Design a protein with these regions (language model features):
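Active-/binding-site microenvironments in catalytic and ligand-binding cores
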Residues: 1-146
């Protein structure tokens, strides 16, 4: 299926999730809102959705058929990763570019949530100070500005 909205730099696709499982990855983190493409979530026509009906309308207007034809499942990447005990961490943010392409100790401290399967975490990378790429500018977050 050709999906003009597919961009592997912006979201994880089903083949990518399977690749993580096949390569025995234990956890994967993302600096984005969700592991799955937004049209695989309840923002579109899945689960209790759509909570953003305009994205379904815009997709159909642009491609001539409902988004659900191309994105039929609800959060398939979540399902693949969770079913195989691969931890997925979304919304990492921060200065990730300063520590990419190197090994470091990563810890995620979750809220205690009895019987929960997901929660926010305090994500921490322990990196020796001499290995931080100081040529990368600090990330700034202008909260409240759109």
């Amino acid at each position: 299926i050709e999906k003009a909205t597919l961009d592997n730099e912006s979201f994880l696709d089903i083949d990518g999730a399977k690749w993580f499982v096949e390569h025995h990855v234990r956890g994967v983190g993302f600096d984005m809102q969700a592991i799955d493409h937004i049209l695989y979530t309840y923002a579109a026509d899945h689960g209790p959705g759509p909570y953003v009906p305009r994205i379904c309308e815009e997709y159909e207007e642009q491609f001539g058929h409902p988004a659900k034809d191309d994105f039929p499942e609800w959060e398939p990447c979540h399902d693949i990763l969770m079913a195989n005990n691969v931890m997925g961490i979304e919304n990492l943010g921060g200065d990730l570019d300063k520590v990419t392409n190197q090994r470091f100790l990563f810890c995620a401290f979750p809220l205690r949530w009895y019987m929960g399967d997901g929660t926010i975490v305090r994500a921490v990378a322990f990196v020796p100070s001499d290995r931080i790429d100081r040529s990368v500018p600090d990330k700034e977050y202008p909260y409240g500005v759109y």
